[in-house]
Swiss-Prot record:
Gene: msbA
Family, as annotated: Belongs to the ABC transporter superfamily. Lipid exporter (TC 3.A.1.106) family.
Function: Involved in lipopolysaccharide (LPS) biosynthesis. Translocates lipid A-core from the inner to the outer leaflet of the inner membrane. Transmembrane domains (TMD) form a pore in the inner membrane and the ATP-binding domain (NBD) is responsible for energy generation.
Segments passing through the bilayer: 29-49, 70-90, 157-177, 261-281, 283-303
Residues binding ATP: G380, R381, S382, G383, S384, G385, K386, S387
Stretches assigned to the ABC transmembrane type-1 domain: 32-314
Name this protein carries in UniProt: ATP-dependent lipid A-core flippase
Cellular location(s): Cell inner membrane
Domain text: In MsbA the ATP-binding domain (NBD) and the transmembrane domain (TMD) are fused.
Amino acid sequence: MTNSTDRPVSVSSWRTYRRLVAFAKPYRLLLVAALIAALIEAAGTTGFLALMKPITDETFIYKNAEVSRWLPVQIILLFVVRGIAGYITDMAMGKSARSIARDLRIKVMAKYLRLPGSRFDSEPVPSMLIRLGSDSDQVAQAAVDAIKVMIQQSLQVIGALALMLWHSWQVTLTILVLAPVLAWVMDKVARRYRRISHSIQESGAHLLQAADQTLSSHQEVKIYGAQQTEMERYGALADRNLRLAMKVESTRGISTATVQMIGAIGLSALLFVAGAQALAGRLTAGDFVVLMTSMLTIIPGLKQLTNVQNMVQRGLASAERLFSVLDSPDEPDQGAVALTRAKGLIEFRDVTARYPGQVNPALADVSFIAQPGTVTAIVGRSGSGKSSLIKLIPRFYDAEAGQILLDGQPVQAYALADLRRQIALVGQQVMLFDGSIAENVAFGEMRSADASQLERAILGANAMEFVAQLPEGLQSHVGAKGGRLSGGQRQRLAIARAMLKDAPILILDEATAALDNESERLVQDALHKLMPDRTTLVIAHRLSTIEHADQVLVMDQGRIVERGTHHELLAQGGLYSHLHGMQFRERQA
């Protein structure tokens, strides 16, 4: 069925930054406000450092009483302004960054719903949840915390350096000799964080997938005594995640120690050159204190800038994972033929279909016609291609060769939304959402249905007998995946949903395979009310349920090997007769 590069880190980062900037455009006023406030905050820090000269010279050396009176007031005012600016920075950055993450999350979710069915075969749902959950949060965290720290600390470092240049350019230039070494260290740290971040996120997705599989199948795990096996598998994945996390910690530790060592060398150079300047009479005690406090402000700022690289690179790696989804091609949808309500004539002409990466086709040269208002049953052993055939009609997948026609037109000629509007589906695994019964029946485009339409559908599906007994009736919540209801009750709600849709084509995918006799009787009765005047395709496990079908297609290894009515196929004594005989003997036993 049709349907980690080694790019240079700097190029990849720049492309990702540019795309994130596009998402930031709606919030540019907030970001400008955050930048202005950050400038004021940095200016406050620089102003405080500048006050070190009059504090030292005027207060302690020249004993100037007037300065001692106005300096405390000035410091208080300075920090009030700085605090207000910091609050504005935090709020503006937080609002814009969280909004960007929300927009990304919504766009990725919408994109997943437009992707072809093959994507859901190749990417497990836990991986999708990682992208929608933690990846989006990582982008927000990088934008809120990391970018905020980078802006604030960068401005403070620049302000402190400017102040140092003003007081002694000779001392400052001596220290700036170390800048290329520091830049090299930070670049190496960023590259390493970037590589590890990708691996950690993939490792986290594998951990979540393993936990989802084990916990979802907890009954089988307990029955077969597989707890130890599953824990060993999960433990191995957790160990790999730990090793990657320790690489991050190792990188952080080494980079922090290196930055501190460079800072210590710079501080030593400052003391040496400043001492020489003071002996020559070119540097006062106040100048020295300003240089010293500025240097002591720069060192932790550089340390924070180095440490925050991990957060930034995690955010960029997460953004790339999200963008890879957004860049995936949508389901092909170029249909232009108008379709309000189909007659329901379905024709397969020499259809061959193959799943991606598979050598053998799922379907091979399949041809048949389903007339409007008739019932076509599709039977065969497990893996014979029954479900694959059904998935081609609503174009969850596209055929590799041949044609599928609806009312004489290839299904590709219709817009996907119009085509799928003609189809109602009742499967073996009914998916109900965590909401009320009414919300689950009047689902999607049917949410505008009135109460009388909803009640008729519920009654027709034989569901009112249990709905009426619930405390809140139609407004009763069904729980996650319909967990508060039995299998038969969920199935009848699915039939009510199909009745309310009133589509001309009905697909029943083993709708009664997992039900007990009483539930099956109620569901079969509801289906008999639903099927008239529709083109119905039934995948049947219990052959006794399709004895009155207008035609039966018997499939084996992706091909139709027999076709005819129930009685005609029994008389032929072929595969259908064999399958029917096996089921009859099982019932007798």
